[in-house]
Amino acid sequence: AHLISSNTFGGIEQHVYELANKMSEESEQIIICNKKIHSYIKDVNKVSIKIGSRYSPLNIFRLLKYLKHNKISLLHCHGAKASTIGKLIRYVSKIKVVSTIHGHKKNNKPFMKVDAVIGVNKKLLRGISNGTYIPNWFNNNHQGKQSTRKGPILAVGRLEKVKGFDHLIQSWINIENKLDIVGSGPEEKSLRSLIDYLNLQDKIKIITNCDYNSI
């Protein structure tokens, strides 16, 4: 089973969905996640369990009860909160827990004392003795070939400061091609303001009502 604690469908959630979808060809997979993101997950089993605080004994008990009832022997936790919960599950059961670090953290305490840790970047695994580096995958069918698709250039991602969409917009001043930014997030308002400020409304659009499968 895969455990996600967030209530929005962003990069981590998409990664988990694609991973579980592929792994379901070999074994049964289920994603434990917030009900708010169920609509984004197709063709993979999913269930919603109220998690709340990562330290709540009641919430931990709910999750543990579900795992035992469904005879789940391996819990793959994604992110710091899910990994903290997984670590507590490991303390009180024989369920194996694997954590994946998806981004830089101030400290790696949530990922300590689990059975195995996966990092998509070698630097993320510093100080973790049982860490394994597995880089993010890509579809090698593209082989670096230029797309034959007609239409605007697409940039897809969650609209957060760390993604650098503001730099992308600023770089578009001298580019004639049209750009569609597909995503949603807290930076949407400021990015729209930046597009207006640079008078790029005719070149750049932000599309928020587009789910994973339609992309």
Please annotate each region the language model reported.
Residues 1, 145-163, 169-176, 180:
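Conserved donor-binding/catalytic core segment of Leloir-type glycosyltransferases
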Residues 2-61, 66, 187:
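N-terminal strand-loop element at the rim of the active site
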Residues 5-8, 156-165, 185-186, 210:
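Short donor-sugar binding/catalytic loops of nucleotide-sugar-dependent glycosyltransferases
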Residues 32-37, 156, 178-191, 208-209:
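Glycosyltransferase donor-sugar binding loop
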Residues 47, 113-143:
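Donor nucleotide-sugar binding/catalytic pocket of nucleotide-sugar-dependent glycosyltransferases
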Residues 56, 77-83, 101:
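Short His-centered aromatic/hydrophobic patch
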Residues 91-126:
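A conserved, positively charged/aromatic
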Residues 192-210:
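Nucleotide-activated donor-binding/catalytic signature segment of Leloir-type glycosyltransferases, i.e.
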